[in-house]
Amino acid sequence: MALVGIVLLGAGVYGIFALMRDDTPSPSAAVEEYLDAWAAGDHDAMAALVVDPPDDFAERHQAVVDELQVEDAAYELDSVDTGGSTGVARYTATLELAGAGTWSYRGSLALTRPDDGDEWLVDWAPSSIHPALADDDHRLVRTSEWPERAPILAADGRPLSEGRPARLIGIEPQAVTDLDGLKAAFQATLGIDPAEIDAKLGAPGVEPHHFVPVTTVDVPTYNAIEDVVYPLPGTRFRDTTLRGGPTPDFAAHVIGTFGEITAERLEELGEPYGPGDLVGLSGLEAAYERQLAGTPTVTVEVVDGGGEVVEELERFEGEEPQPLQTTIDLDVQAAVESAVADATAPTAVVVVDTEGNVRAAASRPIGEFNRAFGGEYPPGSTFMIVSATALLDHGVTPDTPVECTETVDAGGRRFRNFERSSLGTVPFGLAFAQSCNTAFISAAADLSPDDLVAAAERFGFNTEYSLGLRTVGGSYPRPDGVTEQAASVIGQGRVTASPLHMATVGAAVLDGTWEPPVLLPEREVDDAPEPTSIGEGVPEVLRGLMRRVVTEGSGTAAAVPGADVAGKTGTAEWGSGDPPPTHAWFVGLRGDLSVAVIVEGGVAGGEVAAPVAGRVLAALPD
């Protein structure tokens, strides 16, 4: 009997514990599971916790993620209230929106416990995603509005590049009724290939309700075609701006280009940029995109089925753009543009003042790379400015007799003058004025390689610097042997320089100090090179030598009547051939400005580059 009693007692205890333990699923646990699946983007797991989920359940949730650009999401259960077989769970959503910030809101989920089971399920409705989606045709949208782009400024504060009113023409796919007709009209009025429109409409991420940018035109162009394109079903229009200088080619390589973001640029910039945004594509517009653009104001809105805004739910204010100050002088730049307007060969011109400020730069052809800053060429006889400095250091004067023979042998290689000219025994000043290669090679034969390196480095050669754009300076490798030294004295061999650098060489002659060039005066530069003196008494002698080039030497085509202009011609051999092809150089001085000109494939500096420089010099102040 005792044993039976124990068994019965055990059964009684089990019954008590069974009554105390409630195996009914907790509504909080069900909601927590649903919210965790929502945060993870597991729509199948969410749907399994919903009573009668709609067929487009997953698509609706994913559309919110895609439209709002949700990078991360968290959903926290705040409370659960139940009564009988129904209840309400309240939650807080925290969404990280790419390129915007954190958006938090409070929402609720209706709960139900169906009659045929004990499990709590979500009684889903569109408002479960957000309370503002009570109407089935309402949806959440994200909009980005960029601030007006800041200007690029010239030295005096006037705009070098600024926006001009324009119209952005686009397409809303869902509103198009005749795509072929629309494409034909765009081709006829705007010259846009129908395949380009197909590519834009078919790009990844494009939704039927999106505004798909197609092209931007200035206001006069839009006014001329408005009657054709505006009535087309599906066309949409937005006010925007076009960027540029006073004329399309004005300082084009410095300013750069501005237009619709490319796939490569989008990958490079990342947030907060998206397809269709207008950005800098080259030059300063690209290099300083974030400064000039600021950041957009992002809004989260509720819109109805017709796309009309019902309510603004959140706003993230963007950052204001900041202007970019440059050293460009509008008047000097205009003179340079005029000088290269008719250029048929690749040409570059740079103007630098005695403080290293870049006052103007132009490169042609427009559609090719920036030769003014990024071109790397043998400087030819313009390098005689540097070689002359080394010779002056070692006692040569303008009156020192030198031998200007037709040819000279150096280490087994024969060097000659341009067009095989010769002057015989002449003063060094005349040899400089006439750009006599053989005289310089002979006179410099007693110099050591280190003498020439030291002179070159006083003019900034072998110094690294940058303007904030791709920049090439000057390179003077230590000559290896007699032949290479002879070539280097006349700016050949391995000696290279950009037009920018040769403009700084000329500027150093004006006041005796080489200054690293500056385009952006407010730009902070780590380890910027220090100014370098070119030597006591040297500038005065060099200016006199260069004055003779213009008055009686190889650079008379650069002369400006009544003006104190100086300069140095250069004819730089490159490539192969007999004779090899040449680039034409000229470095000119007037007032406190130095002008460097190169014409690729030019026959001779005095004949081709000097006239271009002369047109610039004529427009400069004394």
Where are these regions (language model features)?
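Short, low-complexity N-terminal intrinsically disordered segments enriched in polar/charged residues
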Residues: M1-D36, A40
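Short solvent-exposed beta->alpha transition segments
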Residues: D22-D23, A29, E33, A40-V88
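Solvent-exposed, polar/charged alpha-helical surfaces in well-ordered, non-transmembrane soluble domains
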Residues: S28-D36, D44, A48, D180-A184, ...
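Sec/Tat-exported extracytoplasmic proteins
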Residues: Y34-D42, V50-P54, V65-Q69, P173, ...
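Extracytoplasmic/periplasmic proteins that interact with beta-lactams or build/remodel peptidoglycan
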Residues: D66, V70-P346, H583-W585
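Beta-lactam-recognizing serine transpeptidase/beta-lactamase-like catalytic domain environment
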Residues: V303-L313, A345-G380, T389-G601, G605
